[in-house]
Amino acid sequence: MTDKRDLVILGGGLVGMTLALAAARAGITSHVVDKATPEELTVEGVDGRASAISTASWNLFCNIGLKDRLDPLGCPISAIAVTDGMKPGRIDFEPKPGDGTLGRMYANRDIRIALFEAARAEPAIAWSS
């Protein structure tokens, strides 16, 4: 029997899995293909980076069902300073009182785990490696 899907996604990283979950929310089935398994992609130490998640990206994560998984893990970005080490000067960004934060910081591993947990619970998403 052949499992027919609407969409093939090459790469099960942050972008690919976000797309798969967003597509599932819209009723689109997908098959994610990656050279590694979800377990390999979430093992501790495989990706020590962190990502700054903008408010717009956070809203997307909330809409695809990641809020409860990610909310307790990140830390708010309350100010941003932009500098160029080779030149004088800087630009500072701070939200006005009541505007909330400028975004949130998350370990990439935490985002991946949340994405894979949500995808495992979603029958519209298939995976192969």
Residue ranges of predicted features:
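Conserved N-terminal helical subregion
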Residues: D3, L73-S129
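N-terminal Rossmann-like FAD-binding beta1-loop-alpha1 element of flavoenzymes
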Residues: R5-V32
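Glycine-rich FAD pyrophosphate-binding loop
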Residues: A24-R49
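Residue-level detector of anion-binding/catalytic polar loops
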Residues: T29, K67, A126
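N-terminal FAD cofactor-binding segment of flavoenzymes
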Residues: G45-G85
